[in-house]
Curated annotation (Swiss-Prot):
GO terms for biological process: chaperone-mediated protein complex assembly; nitrate assimilation; response to hypoxia. It comes from Mycobacterium tuberculosis (strain ATCC 25618 / H37Rv). Residues 258-415 are annotated as: Nitrate reductase delta subunit. Binds 1 [4Fe-4S] cluster per subunit. Binds 1 molybdenum-bis(molybdopterin guanine dinucleotide) (Mo-bis-MGD) cofactor per subunit. This is Nitrate reductase-like protein NarX. Its main location: membrane. Mo-bis(molybdopterin guanine dinucleotide) binds at residue 233. The keyword rRNA-binding does not apply. This protein serves as an immunogenic antigen, inducing gamma-interferon responses in whole-blood cultures from M.tuberculosis-exposed adults in Uganda and South Africa, indicating this might be a good vaccine candidate. Heme b 1 binds at residues 469, 620. The chain crosses the membrane at residues 416-436, 466-486, 504-524, 545-565, 595-615. The lineage of its organism: Bacteria, Bacillati, Actinomycetota, Actinomycetes, Mycobacteriales. Disruption phenotype: No visible phenotype. PANTHER family: NITRATE REDUCTASE PRIVATE CHAPERONE, REDOX ENZYME MATURATION PROTEIN REMP FAMILY (PTHR30598), RESPIRATORY NITRATE REDUCTASE 1 GAMMA CHAIN (PTHR30598:SF3).
Amino acid sequence: MTVTPRTGSRIEELLARSGRFFIPGEISADLRTVTRRGGRDGDVFYRDRWSHDKVVRSTHGVNCTGSCSWKIYVKDDIITWETQETDYPSVGPDRPEYEPRGCPRGAAFSWYTYSPTRVRHPYARGVLVEMYREAKARLGDPVAAWADIQADPRRRRRYQRARGKGGLVRVSWAEATEMIAAAHVHTISTYGPDRVAGFSPIPAMSMVSHAAGSRFVELIGGVMTSFYDWYADLPVASPQVFGDQTDVPESGDWWDVVWQCASVLLTYPNSRQLGTAEELLAHIDGPAADLLGRTVSELRRADPLTAATRYVDTFDLRGRATLYLTYWTAGDTRNRGREMLAFAQTYRSTDVAPPRGETPDFLPVVLEFAATVDPEAGRRLLSGYRVPIAALCNALTEAALPYAHTVAAVCRTGDMMGELFWTVVPYVTMTIVAVGSWWRYRYDKFGWTTRSSQLYESRLLRIASPMFHFGILVVIVGHGIGLVIPQSWTQAAGLSEGAYHVQAVVLGSIAGITTLAGVTLLIYRRRTRGPVFMATTVNDKVMYLVLVAAIVAGLGATALGSGVVGEAYNYRETVSVWFRSVWVLQPRGDLMAEAPLYYQIHVLIGLALFALWPFTRLVHAFSAPIGYLFRPYIIYRSREELVLTRPRRRGW
């Protein structure tokens, strides 16, 4: 072994070597390392505590539904510890994700499993067991033995008073079930089956156990009570304060219940329709539930024959309020078959056969699919036809039909109205810009460029105008790159997403601040210079306010979306895709509806600015002398300077 000598002084070497008297271990020849053996005994406990041979997926069943997935760490077939599993499939960007799964009870399940107090045998009150065995030996019949005990008030009071005082003894499973059966038979034969009441010990119990017990009570004619009918503790506050009905569903389940209820109400009226809808409505509340409840109330008041004929007149005999979604977009053309095929393929992709009795685009069928089979795929189908669904709602509302409330409830699920807004408003803005610009040029050509204020004041203008115009040009170019060029293109060019956003934030912030400073000076000039202020129209004043708001909102979106303040957000995956989809006439309003609020505010202000554009002095942008850059050369002949008796006056 080659030893590297130390380069320190003699005193330093002596001090280093003297350390062997104080530090246990072997010092290397170069005095640079110390090797110790042992001293890690304290780590053994932790290594053994968290060691395991394998990891299995399981759940726990201590007063629980067993719906939470746990990772169970096992060593030598013994549970050592457990952690929550987090690989639940996503429900998609349009729906609330599952609430966190796993509670402290589950985290301590191994304690329950190996607890010395774990119940491993059937137990019964010792006093009652003695009386039952004596009566059965004397009478020879289990039911007669139980009846004999109940007929004697003294013996009955004796075992009842023993409750809560211990005195439990082990009994066999056969004897325990025999005593339970004898008690049920005696109670039913003496008082009737309705004197037998069943309930769950806690709402969060095994669904198999609850189903078996409730089915047994129903088969013998007993009464199945709800958990809140007897459990007078904290959970009762939930239904009293929030209006929840017994067990509370997750937020995502509310949409499923609304879709299921709407599917029931939009089908042909039958005797079970309203009862099923009311049963579903018992589990949800809120505006959507109120709308569905209004439909149920109006149909409940109507005569069955009247409701049936009104349904036929509304949906079967009139195309203006049809429930077949593709008819709204394709009409009676061959394209409708192609669109219906998309519905059928969606159903088959989830291993569900398309309906045979109805076409796959029938709205109740789509709602049923979204509620019970694949919420994400159903959500996409409903979002793709949000405009026809909104038109159907308007048609039913104009006709004052009760089904309008149901369709309105469907529109409220998720952000369908928001999707419709971001689908329609861009085209409304484009129409205003096109028609308004034509009108302005046709009827106000003189005012197109004559409202310039350059003649009134030029000192501030020479400073503010370049700042604003050069800044806004950089902002426009940046918006064009971010909105028009797909993210995949910049990545293919070797520009990573992180590098792109850094450049966008830096350059965009500088350009935005420059633009804001320039427009601030322009507004100050217009307000403080009398002639300039007099030449400013009301529309221009509103335009300046909207313009400043758009710039401020853009700077805010840049800061918030970049992660400088708050969590970073990649707008190129939603806002940019929405922008491009608008121009190819395939608007994805759902993407814009998913964007954060600060992006929505910025885009909304921008659309308002474009809507004001034709009616303000911003139209001078259309008169920019672009042709001046490509003008032909002008040939002229120089002339000798004239000798005058007095200096020439400047022309400006």
